Every structure is written in structure tokens, then in C-alpha cells.
Amino acid sequence: MTLTLDEVRHAIVARENPTLTAAEVELHAVTVHRILELKQQHGVVILGHNYMEPLVYGLSEKIEQGDSLGLSRSAAETEAEFIIFNGVRFMAETAKILSPEKRVLIADREAGCSLADNFGATEVQQIRAAHPGVPVMIYVNSYAEAKAECDVCCTSANAAHIALALPGDELIFVPDLFFAQNLEDELQGRKRVIYPGQGNGGHGAVCEVHEQFTLDDIRAVRNGFDIPPGHPTRRLYVHWECRPEVLREADFYGSTTQISNDIAQHVAAGSLERAFIASECELTSNLMEEFPTVQFWTACSVRCSHMARITLEKILPMLEAIDAGDDLQQWEVDLPPKVIEAAAAPIQRMMELSAAS
């Protein structure tokens, strides 16, 4: 059931910065209410990544929210004709690959990713040629053309499991340099991990958000926010894409959903009073709303410029175009059938190996 306009107003006032003017609250409320109204009217699924700002994130039902792996599964399972993906372009591409018969839309097709933008199909071909016969595992933060050149895909939630499930004693991991190093540490010698940027092996890409966190930053948080290592009710969380030396300082590390689940478990047990998350700041914003009893130290200078391109003002016109039966070309994700077919294989293999865990 769609919220009334008055209910939306109250939710925005409770959720947002109290410095919002009455006019700003009204503008947001009218926009959100209209989006939710059209979403329900046309049976549109709105998938929301954890890095969306709270007002955008809140457009998605709980089952429509999550990290790349969860949203990929949701895209594959939905029967809706229209999928609006509130995330970045590679995520919307993945939804299209898994549901080629569906119409997948993204509010801004220029919403890229520093990992995907800096490592494409040509780079995959080069590293594969340098290591013939070695399986290539590609992080989901990549475009369809690059995925099409690989054997299996992975997300930050399942990379270690997928790596161990592959045949042989070595694998190629692309494109994330820091994630590859962290995966290598996690596997503890059970597999050799080959990755771009290793030795003289070309360049590796990094996440422009997570690379900002340094060891000095993490130690400053521990001291300034009083989160000593091993504290029973205070925890420091780190995302897989951070530098290895930062990851080693964590009380818990993982994907956004793994971090969220750990917080939920500790809150349920009454064993979490304070937390810091070394990741995109809107993840913390959304968790602050979900877990109001936890004191979070925010890092909201650390924002993904690509995720920030997805706004209420860009989402509403898509739904209005659906309502009017207008052309959706400027928002629609369109991939060549051959690319969809080739990129689907490594994603489907990931799904199969994940389900076997």
C-alpha cells in the first residue's frame, strides 16, 4: 500500500537533516510520493543498492535492497516487466543479462565505476593470454564486455567461496588490485592468485571510494571514537575493496550485506553500541536508520560520485515516461544479444557455485 503524502512528509522529517526547509521537505515529499504511486500502479521493481542516499534507498522494499549479489538474484527472480536499478551502470547491465526479456532502466547511464571504467575486455584478454589455461574470475564491478571474456563472476560476498570452488591451484582475479590482494590473504596459500598490477603484470584498478581509507585513518578512528581492538560492544568494519593493511585492522570485514548482517546479529544480541564502517558513507546513513540504538561514526566525505548521480529528480521522469507510454531509450540498458549470451555464462556459474555453498 502506497504511503499517503502526509506519511511521506513525516518520514522525511524523521529521516533527513533537520536543517531542511519546509519547502525542501515538501519538494522531496511530493517527488517520493509520486514515485511510489507510479511504482505501485505499474508494478515496477525498484532495486536499491546499499550506497544509495536514504531517500532513494527508501524507494525500494526491503527485499529489493542489498549488495550486488542479492540484487542480481532479485533481478533474475522478478516477474516485473520494468526493473529500475538504483545503482551504477554495471549493476543495471547485470540485471539485463540475467533478465534479457525485461526492460531495465537506470536514472543516469553515465553512472560509472572506477573499477569497471579502468579495466575492460582488452585487458582481460591480455592477462588471459599471459596465463593460458588459468581460469579467470571477474569481480561483478565490471562491464558486460569484460565479463564476456571470463570464466566466472564473483561479488564481494562470495569471492573466497568461488575461488576455492574453481579447478586447479591458481586463478586470475580481475580487476580490483586491493581486493585481489585481500583475497590472496584470505585463501592463505590454498590457491595462487594472479592479478593485474602484480609485479610487472600491468595495471590494476581500484575503487575510488575505498582507496581513500588509509591505515592512519583507521587508527585515528580507533583512538578518536574509542573502538579498541577486541572490544566486546564496539566494532570497526572494513569493506573488501580497502587496502590490505586497512582490512587487517578490522574487527570484521566483508561485503556490504555481510557487514549489515553482522551488525544486525550483534544488535539482536545486545552486543553492539558503537561502530565505524570503512566504506561508502551512505551505507552508514542507511544503517543508522535501520539500527538507531547503535552510535555510528560517519565518514560522509567518502561518497561515490557515480552512485550520487542517481537522484529522486532523475528517477521520477522514468516512471512518468512509463506511465505515459513514452520512449524510454535515454534510460534503458541495451546490450547486444551476443554480449548478453557470453556474459551470462560466468554470472550463471557464479550463481550455481554460490547456491552450492
What label would you give each PLM region?
Residues M1-S357:
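Active-site loop-to-helix "anion-binding N-cap" substructures in soluble metabolic enzymes
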